[in-house]
Each structure stands twice: as C-alpha cells, then as structure tokens.
Amino acid sequence: MNEIDQIYNRISENTNTFLGYPLAKDFSYKEFAPFLDLCINNVGDPESDSTLAIDTKDQERECISFFADILSSNTKDTWGYVTNGGTEGNLYGLYLARESYPDAVVYYSESTHYSVKKNLHLLNINNIVVRSQDNGEMDYDDLEQILMLRRDKPAIFFLNIGTTMTEAVDKLDEVKRIIKKYAIKDYYIHCDAAFLGTIAPFVTPKPKFDFSEGVDSIAISGHKFIGGPIPCGIVMVKRKHRDRIANSVSYVGTLDTTITGSRNGLTPLFLWAFIKKHGKEGLKNRVKESQELAAYLEMELNKIGVKAWRNNEALTVVLEKPSKEICKKYQLASEENIAHVICMPGIKKEQLNVFLEDLKKELAEILCALV
C-alpha cells in the first residue's frame, strides 16, 4: 500500500465513525474530478468579471441568489460571496461593522465560537463578553446591565444562530427590545449562522435572524450541512455596507470587496451543484430527516440512563461526557462535563445504535465496579 492510499484509508475510516462534528457525510462530487487539473480562481468581487477568466463566478452568483432568497432578501438589497468558511464570514461582518462604527463596542456571549476573539483582536475592536444561560443562549439581563452603562456608544451585536456546543440561538427580538429601551441609535447586528444558516430557514418556528428582521450581515458555513470535500462558507451583507468598502483594482479588472484576493473557484461549483440538484425542498427534507434522527437519539440516551437534551428542534444532542475512549472513538467534541452528537446527513440510525450499545457497556462496567 502506498502512502497516498494510507492517507486516504485513515481519513475514510475516521469519517465513517465520527459523530461529534457538524459535517455531512452523504455527498459525492466525483463528476468534478477533471476540475482538479485546473487552477480555478474567482479573484475579486463575484459580481464583476476579472481579466483572469478561469473562474466560476456565474455559478457563485447563482449560489448567492439562492442564499439571498432563503434569507428573505434579494441581490438588489444584499450582496455576498463564497468564503473559506464561517470564520472568514464573521471576520467580514465585523470588518463592515467597524467601518460603519469605528468607535463601537462589540457585545457577544461567552458561548460564541473561539475564532471570534481572534477576529476582534485582528480588527482591534473594543468588545465585552456577555454571560450565557445554561442552554448556551445569551443572558439578556446581563446584556442589558452592560449596555445600560454604555448607551451613548455605538454598538455591534454579535448574535449566535446555533452555538458550537449546544446549538443555542440568541433571540433577536430580545436584543431589539434592549436597543429600543435604551434608545441606541447607532448599531449593527451580525449573525453567526455558521451551522444553522442552511437549517434555520426550514425550522418551525423559524428563528429570527435574516434580513427581513433588520440584521446587517450573516455568516454561514457551506461545507457543514450541505456537505463538501473542501471547507467553505457564504457571507451575506446589506449592499450599502459592501459599497462603503469597495475599491477598484485596475490590473485585475475587478472590485476589491472581499477579504482575500484570490478565491477558491471549486467550492462555489460544489455549492451550485448541490443547489441545482436539491433546491429548497431538498434542504427542507434534509432538515426533517436529521431532526428525526436527533429526536430518536435523545430519547434512547435518556432511556438507558444517560442524561441528554436538545435546544428547540436542534440537530445537536447534548449528553453527559462519556469516557475518553468513547469520545476518541466517535470524535466527540466536549467541554467541561458535557459532550455532543450532531445528527448530520449521512449518519444512519444503525451507527447511533452502535454508539448506544457502547454507552450501555460502559454504564454496565461502572455499575459492576460499584458493587
């Protein structure tokens, strides 16, 4: 067996067993294999063609139009591009917020993804961490107490639409209530919908986080629920914010509006292929199947004596942290005394049953040791 086969087999085997990360497993893009022999570069703004004509910008624009639609907007009022992932999308949203309000303070909960602190450091923005509730949602009383002392300063609200560990959703209505109560006139709302951006539009009741609710920017992961071999994301913003930072670059013949200059041209192709094949109805069915799987796992875990719970209609099942051996075998993300299983497309009930049997054995061994 050569080294390349060894690498492939290791990754393939580990892909089959993981349960703790939000990555779909049921995709195949084999028909795009010939593209691996090409350098595809979507340099610059997706809406303007470059002097470098080896891109997939037509397909990228179709993707952006699709996401504008499911986020209750259109490409006249909003603009976006395919990013390298959720972190870049959050960086871009915070960058636009800073350009709008250079003296603002960013408010975000302690359950926010670790990369956001790094983004805030890179952008050198003043920020304050807000406490979280037990379910991972922002503590609005704490936000109110903090904001009350800073009501005269511009504010940037960084809201989580599905936290990393518990899939908690910060309530936009609560934040808007506080904004109104303290008459904050200069503010910007960014939503980190890395995981739920492709799920929440099809959940009942639908979380409030899109452009119809007055948000300014939204970051979404493209490779998680949709699935794909290369990490990617989508960032959507109000067009007026993008226009504020746009610069023309003559030698590439396009506008400079994105974080990176050279941009991956393969990932828009994968997203475009998924959208063409499945559309909104396909995403809706995908969400329903994953929710049913999560409900099954939550019920079965509690049946065998493992305390488990979910936020409303979540795909993330939070459970008491199992042994190191089980966490390693199933690649479970854990924090303090909890771990989680995320019921993504491609995970089958049979795999969950094997996981449940392993937990049963572990519980039986613990009971025997106590006798």
Name what the model sees in each region.
Residues G44-T51, K76-G80, N127-S132, P154-I161, ...:
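Glycine- and acidic
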Residues F27, E31, E47-Q59, V82-G85, ...:
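Catalytic cores of large soluble enzymes that bind and process phosphate-bearing ligands
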Residues Q6, K117, N247-T258, E281-V371:
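Conserved C-terminal alpha-helix-loop-beta "cap" of PLP-dependent enzymes
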Residues M1-D77, N337-I342, L370:
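N-terminal entrance/gating region of PLP-dependent enzymes' catalytic architecture
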Residues K76-D77, Y81-A246, L266:
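Conserved PLP-enzyme active-site core in the AAT-like
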Residues P201-E313:
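Active-site C-terminal subdomain of aminotransferase-like
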Residues K57-E60, I64, N90, L172, ...:
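Hydrophobic face of alpha-helices
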